[in-house]
From Swiss-Prot:
Name of the gene encoding the protein in the UniProt record: fhs
Natural source organism: Beijerinckia indica subsp. indica (strain ATCC 9039 / DSM 1715 / NCIMB 8712)
Protein name per UniProt: Formate--tetrahydrofolate ligase
Disulfide bonds, paired cysteine numbers: none
Highest taxon, organism lineage: Bacteria
GO function terms (MF aspect): ATP binding; formate-tetrahydrofolate ligase activity
Enzymatic reactions: (6S)-5,6,7,8-tetrahydrofolate + formate + ATP = (6R)-10-formyltetrahydrofolate + ADP + phosphate
Length: 555
């Protein structure tokens, strides 16, 4: 079979104006970026009395074998359109870090892709650049404020705002700025995070409109002053310029699938170190256009789905009508202890052991009151016995249906059975959405509930630094915020080596960060880093141009 890149290049894309017109997007709302990409002015969209039904796609804990969550999201959207439903897909934008690192892009695969694939994976309309620029403008204004000794007097030892870059670069995790003499400012320790972990990214993705964005930017707490009082971005007169940088970027990007399904690609926070959901602006816009909106949350349901349901839905006032959990026989065998080299071999004992991971994710999503269906993303190495074991276990032990899906090879046609089941779940009206915790629960108890109810942990632990940070945040009046957990994506535990469905473990919290503008508190667990590093053999080694100027090695 052709590679993803070859399939994407062979596709006959429709003009984005045609895609927009079929989605009932007014021509005056369309800001074209070439023939196949546009931004949408959401203020000009028609308002529906009954917004579309929202379907959340999530997955088991990821493995090197891959699950195909984005591919399934796209295949499901195409299948719903084949069944006559007006469907819009809402996805996150890819980050350059994973594209040049290990994970790769985020445009799906096979015949379930969004296009133009190369452009989406590399810059798209420049939103990440705008977010990076706005974030680093605030950082520059902080150091300029320190240099001139302006009021309020910032304590240079208490600056919390780091810089960001949309790249995996471990050398920038801890740095010293202001070296080289008094003309270069005050030396102090700081560091870089990846743009996807930026609070500006979170604010960007949680803002409903420009007014909401500007209000959130003003609330960012960047430091303490010499009297131990919080210093906000508005005190540095930063908000107006930051908003200007983000104004056009806040308009959602419209692209299409290989089958022409309209797709919003907007915002890109990671789910392991941020909240892992596409923008509220894009999701709300999609819900005004279609009968169904299919969206995804990053990594496994323990991270992305929990944050989608406890953070995004809480702040945006939305609720899904059903959830799809993606798994593969290969990934389940990996959770059952099979080495990567042996994943193509049938191993029913390992598969049975690995199914415990899927079972916990199913139980967790049900705790939010959502009906669930499992999508088994089919691989050529899957055997009939493996498919039967998955189906029987899901039905008999977990009380859900598992559907064999072949959208990678067949596009929307390969996900028709999944789409029919999703329609049945949605139209059955059984969803009774509820969040895992109330706003009034103390922050430490919110974290404990997530750890025990979602991760299967015995308890949590906080070191002295984290305890003080948590106490300070509570004292400042932010105890009502939801919790955003930064944790390894590979396990329910903070240890990435604990596969399957571990129980009885302790979740160690080493740092607590306040994101006052985004409206949540970040709990950093274990060894997770907010600036990733490149792998021993980064994907960047294989990427280049051929003699005709075409990109090679992207996927």
């Amino acid at each position: 079979m052709s590679s993803d890149l070859e399939i994407a290049r062979a596709a006959k894309l429709r003009p984005i104006a045609t895609v927009a017109d079929e989605a009932k997007i007014p021509a005056e709302a369309l800001h074209s970026y070439g023939l196949h990409v546009a931004k949408i002015d959401t203020s000009l969209l028609p308002k529906k009395d009954r917004p579309a039904k929202l379907v959340l796609v999530t997955a088991i804990n990821p493995t090197p074998a891959g699950e195909g969550k984005t591919t399934t999201t796209i295949g499901l959207g195409d299948a719903l359109r084949r069944l006559g439903k007006a469907c819009v897909i809402a996805l996150r934008e890819p980050s350059l870090g994973p594209c040049f690192g290990t994970k790769g892009g985020a445009t799906g695969g096979g015949y379930a892709q969004i296009v133009p694939m190369e452009r989406i994976n590399l810059h798209l309309t420049g939103d990440f650049h705008a977010i990076t620029s706005a974030h680093n403008l605030l950082a520059a204004l902080i150091d300029n404020h320190l240099y001139w000794g302006a009021e309020p007097k910032i304590d240079s030892r208490k600056v919390a705002w780091r810089r960001v870059l949309d790249m995996n670069d471990r050398a920038l995790r801890q740095i010293v700025v202001g070296l080289g003499g008094g003309g270069n400012g005050y030396p102090r320790e700081t560091g870089f995070d990846i743009t996807a972990a930026s609070e500006i990214m979170a604010i960007f993705c949680l803002s409903k409109d420009l007014a909401d964005l500007q209000q959130r930017l003003a609330q960012i707490i960047v430091a303490q002053d010499v009297n131990k009082q919080p210093v906000r971005a508005d005190a540095l007169q930063a908000v107006g310029a930051m908003t200007v940088l983000l104004k056009d970027a806040l308009m959602p990007n419209l692209v299409q699938t290989l089958e022409g399904t309209p797709t919003f690609v907007h915002g890109g926070p990671f789910a392991n170190i941020a909240h892992g959901c596409n923008s509220v602006a894009a999701t709300l816009a999609a819900m005004q256009l279609g009968d169904y909106v299919v969206t995804e949350a990053g990594f496994g349901a323990d991270l992305g789905a929990e944050k989608f349901l406890d953070i995004k839905c809480r702040q945006a006032g939305i609720a899904p009508s059903a959830a799809v959990i993606v798994a593969t026989a290969r990934a389940l065998k990996s959770h059952g202890g099979v080495a990567p080299a042996d994943l193509n071999k049938e191993n029913l004992d390992a598969l049975k052991a690995g199914l415990a991971n899927l079972g916990r994710h199913i139980a967790n999503v049900k705790k939010f009151g959502l009906p669930v269906v499992v999508a088994i993303n089919h691989f050529l190495s899957d055997t009939e016995a493996e498919q039967e074991l998955i189906a029987h276990t899901c039905r008999d032990e977990y009380g859900v249906e598992a559907i064999d899906c072949r959208h990678w090879a067949a596009g929307g046609k390969g996900a028709l059975a999944l789409a029919e089941k999703v329609i049945a779940l949605v139209e059955g009206g059984t969803a009774q959405f509820k969040m895992l915790y109330e706003d009034t629960l103390p922050l430490i108890e919110k974290m404990r509930r997530i750890a025990q109810e979602i991760y299967g942990a015995a308890d949590i632990s906080l070191d002295a630094k984290a305890k003080k940070q948590l106490a300070d945040i509570e004292a400042q009046g932010f105890g009502h915020f939801p919790v955003c957990v930064a944790k390894t994506q590979y396990s329910f535990a903070a240890d990435p080596k604990l596969l399957g469905a571990p129980t009885g473990h302790i979740v160690p919290i080493r740092e607590v960060r306040l994101s006052a503008g985004a409206g949540f508190v970040v709990m950093i667990c274990g060894d997770i880093m907010t600036m990733p590093g490149l792998s021993r053999q980064p994907a960047a080694w294989k990427i280049g141009l051929d003699a005709q100027g075409n990109i090679e090695g992207l996927f």
